[in-house]
């Protein structure tokens, strides 16, 4: 397992990390806490994974408690990432929540500090290695108090690196662009980026290169929600609680057709491993967070760090296929975020952040 660094922070992480949303939310099948802890320990002990990405909203703190159980006696050997911003403490909102709908978000300094203290308690630690604001939207990007709070938490030693996680849809282009313009000392951005879903991630990378010299990226949904694992067919039926069950059938059919164009990537590695190597070819990618939900996947994806890099010809062919949408004609992607540059008039009409 190779490692990369968040520049200027002292934080070094494995090229392949482990995102705990597959273990703690039930959206990828149910896992007991004992099963989750066993997988986390195997990731570290057997495969050299050192970066573990949680969020307070994953299972209402469950992912953080799983980390504390798995690594409580060896805290200094692993790197914890977590995310804040959803008000998981609002009982009324929790009871009214339906399915995977979003909880209310809060980014005022007092709430952020409260959320961090609760994360520290659940993680059973006195510092967080990487803290990101979870699914920030444009009003939060434009709230300087939120980012000053992140810097203050860093000075106080409660966090070592800070940034933002964009989603849950793959949009949010100008949220990220404006963030690196406004806060050029930001350490990291978490975003969706993969061979099949290159936009808007590529544009986010270009913005960081232009404005934020030390901003690196931790990548989630590395396999296009499983499509790049190369295991699905047009007849696949996802389990009842699997979030992909609720996607339109065209997502599955078109995805399978796109994947069939990528056989040339599997001459020296599995498609899943080659998909991670495609990401790792970008120097600003500090770590990848594939969705891991069984031991076989864990072994396959962790081995991707040592898999042969893609050749220049393979990289060129992927780029050419992407320009042609992998030979598939489909409706344009719809996004939840800001995919056009807001004008000054738009900004004036936008909701303003709450007072601290």
Sequence positions of predicted segments:
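N-terminal binding-site loop/beta-alpha segment at the start of enzyme catalytic domains
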Residues: 1-79
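Short, acidic/polar
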Residues: 30-43, 105-123, 170-179, 275
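Acidic (Asp/Glu)-rich catalytic clusters
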Residues: 8-10, 69-76, 120-124, 151-155, ...
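Alpha-helix N-cap and loop-to-helix initiation/capping positions
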Residues: 28-35, 62, 66, 100-111, ...
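N-terminal small/glycine-rich loop or linker at the start of catalytic domains
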Residues: 9-28, 81-103, 130
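Conserved, mostly hydrophobic/aromatic
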Residues: 6, 18, 36, 52, ...
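Beta/alpha (TIM)-barrel catalytic core signal, keyed to glycine-rich beta->alpha loops juxtaposed to Asp/Glu
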Residues: 3, 135-329, 339-356
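Active-site groove signature of glycoside hydrolases
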Residues: 120-139
């Amino acid at each position: 397992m190779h490692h990369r660094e968040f520049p200027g922070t002292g934080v070094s992480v494995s090229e392949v990390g482990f995102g705990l949303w597959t273990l703690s939310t039930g959206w990828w099948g149910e896992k007991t806490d004992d099963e989750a802890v066993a997988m986390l320990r195997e990731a570290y002990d057997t495969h050299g994974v050192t970066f573990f990405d949680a969020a307070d909203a994953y299972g209402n703190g469950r992912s953080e408690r799983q980390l504390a159980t798995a690594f409580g006696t060896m805290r200094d050997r692993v790197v914890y990432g977590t995310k804040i911003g959803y008000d998981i403490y609002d009982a009324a909102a929790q009871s009214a929540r339906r399915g995977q709908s979003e909880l209310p978000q809060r980014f005022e300094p007092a709430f952020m500090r409260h959320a961090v203290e609760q994360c520290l308690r659940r993680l059973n630690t006195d510092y967080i290695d990487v803290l990101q604001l979870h699914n920030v939207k444009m009003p939060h990007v434009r709230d300087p108090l939120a980012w000053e709070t992140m810097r203050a938490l860093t000075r106080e030693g409660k966090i070592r690196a800070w940034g933002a996680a964009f989603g849950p849809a793959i949009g949010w282009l100008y949220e990220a662009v404006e963030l690196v313009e406004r806060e050029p000392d930001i350490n990291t951005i978490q975003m969706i980026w993969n061979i099949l879903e290159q936009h808007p991630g590529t544009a986010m990378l270009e913005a960081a290169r232009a404005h934020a010299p030390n901003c690196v990226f931790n990548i989630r949904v590395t396999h296009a929600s499983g499509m790049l694992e190369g295991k699905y067919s047009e007849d696949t039926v996802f389990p009842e609680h699997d979030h992909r069950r609720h996607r339109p059938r065209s997502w599955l059919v078109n995805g399978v057709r796109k994947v069939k164009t990528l056989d040339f990537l599997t001459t020296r590695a599995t498609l899943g491993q080659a998909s991670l190597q495609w990401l790792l070819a970008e120097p600003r990618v500090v770590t990848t967070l594939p969705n891991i939900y069984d031991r076989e996947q864990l072994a396959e994806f962790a081995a991707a760090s040592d898999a042969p890099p893609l050749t220049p010809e393979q990289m060129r062919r992927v780029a050419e296929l992407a320009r042609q949408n992998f030979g598939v004609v489909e409706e344009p992607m719809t996004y939840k975020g800001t995919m056009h540059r807001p004008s000054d008039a738009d900004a004036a009409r936008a909701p303003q952040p709450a007072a601290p």
